């Protein structure tokens, strides 16, 4: 059973990293529900902050389904952007600009190149959808950043 089985999934892909549809494809064989998927330009957003509309959607999804049932998957091209997005859905919007300012959701959040995602999905689909970008991204830096954010702010230890 996958860590995503039975979960509601929010995908925030990145135009310059892993796009939303690629992450979605990886999840198709798993019994989970993608409730929202987008592909953003993390570099384009103000200071790399998470899009305000996405913050609103994540807040509403958490209220509707419960934090324990929600997982956020990120495809950011850079560790810093991934960290900002992860911090936003765990500790609240660090820019204090959006609906998640001061709101500690503590959600499970993973990057598409982390083993927590990669090891849970079909290897062939992952290779086809994410493999090329995995070769050019600084995976170690992304993993380190994501683990740091989760260890500080995630309310779930699985």
Swiss-Prot record:
It is an enzyme of class 1 (oxidoreductase). It holds the Pfam family GRDA. It catalyses: acetyl phosphate + [thioredoxin]-disulfide + NH4(+) + H2O = [thioredoxin]-dithiol + glycine + phosphate + H(+); acetyl phosphate + methylamine + [thioredoxin]-disulfide + H2O = sarcosine + [thioredoxin]-dithiol + phosphate + H(+); acetyl phosphate + trimethylamine + [thioredoxin]-disulfide + H2O = glycine betaine + [thioredoxin]-dithiol + phosphate + H(+). The active site is at residue 44. Its EC number is 1.21.4.2, 1.21.4.3, 1.21.4.4. InterPro entries: GRDA. GO terms for cellular component: glycine reductase complex. Keywords: Oxidoreductase, Selenocysteine. One of its GO terms (molecular function) is sarcosine reductase activity. In the first step of glycine, betaine and sarcosine reductases, the substrate is bound to component PB via a Schiff base intermediate. Then the PB-activated substrate is nucleophilically attacked by the selenol anion of component PA to transform it to a carboxymethylated selenoether and the respective amine. By action of component PC, acetyl phosphate is formed, leaving component PA in its oxidized state. Finally component PA becomes reduced by the thioredoxin system to start a new catalytic cycle of reductive deamination. Belongs to the GrdA family. NCBIfam families: reduct_selen_A. Monomer. Component of the glycine, sarcosine and betaine reductase complexes, together with components B and C. This is Glycine/sarcosine/betaine reductase complex component A. It comes from Acetoanaerobium sticklandii (strain ATCC 12662 / DSM 519 / JCM 1433 / CCUG 9281 / NCIMB 10654 / HF) (Clostridium sticklandii). The lineage of its organism: Bacteria, Bacillati, Bacillota, Clostridia, Peptostreptococcales. The gene is grdA.
